[in-house]
């Protein structure tokens, strides 16, 4: 009996060596995705679990992608606020992917565009230096901000992404703010997308996320 037990153990060990993917990897863990955003990612005015970040987590489960999602988004946050708390978040969660969705509140408050770009640059660099990949989520301003301002605001995301070779989603609210059904996709404040809009938002983000964590 002892001899049979030893033979069985030896066979299992041999199989584990022959099929390394089946063997446990010491110290391995599921990838962590850290989302640092504002109210557009923090489920402002929504029923809990209906925002695009929660929907992304469910999509991962459906597609059998074992990843942990940390949503560190805060309503009203600016790029300065995100920058000030990112280092601590990186140390705490050690993410494999950092999604940065900030900047809209900078524009709403009339903050200088160079400052917004500098903050996004610093956040991207800090995340990359920690070993994480970065996905920048861009925003666009309504026409009443002026064509020149809108173009410069949108361009800063592309600039930061290009300089740092980071991934980019050019416009989080594509097909939401600029679609034919935009009137029914916003809350009463006409600023924040409603529950019906968030599956569309996820459609904008998911292809890039999947590529980065696959």
Segments from the language model and where they lie:
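N-terminal export leaders
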Residues: 1-11
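A detector of low-complexity, intrinsically disordered, Ser/Thr/Gly/Pro/Ala-rich segments
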Residues: 3-5, 30, 96
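Alpha-helical cap/lid subdomain in secreted, periplasmic
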Residues: 61, 65, 81-214
């Amino acid at each position: 009996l002892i001899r049979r037990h030893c033979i069985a153990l030896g066979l299992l060990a041999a199989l584990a060596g022959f099929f390394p993917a089946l063997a446990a990897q010491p110290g391995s863990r599921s990838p962590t995705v850290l989302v640092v955003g504002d109210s557009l990612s923090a489920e402002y005015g929504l029923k809990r679990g209906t925002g695009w970040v929660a929907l992304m987590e469910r999509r991962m489960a459906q597609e059998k992608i074992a990843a942990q999602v940390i949503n560190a988004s805060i309503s009203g946050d600016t790029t300065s606020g995100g920058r000030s708390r990112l280092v601590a978040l990186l140390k705490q969660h050690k993410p494999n992917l950092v999604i940065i969705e900030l900047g809209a509140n900078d524009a709403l408050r009339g903050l200088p565009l160079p400052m917004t770009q500098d903050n996004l640059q610093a956040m991207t660099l800090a995340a990359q230096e920690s070993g994480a990949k970065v996905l920048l989520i861009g925003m666009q301003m309504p026409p009443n901000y002026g064509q020149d301002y809108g173009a410069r605001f949108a361009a800063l995301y592309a600039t930061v992404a290009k300089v740092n070779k980071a991934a980019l989603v050019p416009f989080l609210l594509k097909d939401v703010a600029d679609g034919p059904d935009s009137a029914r996709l916003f809350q009463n404040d006409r600023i924040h997308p409603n529950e019906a809009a968030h599956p569309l938002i996820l459609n904008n983000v998911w292809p890039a996320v999947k590529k980065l964590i696959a």
